[in-house]
Amino acid sequence: MKKQWIETINNAWENRTLLNEENTQNTIHQIIEEVDKGRLRVAETENGNWKVNDWVKKAIILYFPIQKMETIEVGPLEFHDKMKLKSNYKELGVRVVPHAIARYGAYL
């Protein structure tokens, strides 16, 4: 699957009209979910050296044009963004102080 994802992302990177295709959008969403859960990373160590997964970085950038802007209301606060906010900080074991924000796709 990873090989297919890389090919789909690299093709969409070179030809942005492919962002209109359902398969491309589904691939991007699957990659973002994997990054969100910490199973896939933009950069990782390999044999003691850091390696950048360019295709993951490209998928994150390509995520923005396929998302719609939406208003997100949290208590008295209002945001207007293309990415959902993360939730369930307690279950994630993460301390979040007032007005800290993490978006969906960020592994904590």
Where in the sequence are the language-model features?
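Structural signal for interior beta-strand "rungs" in well-ordered beta-sheet cores
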Residues: 90, 94-108
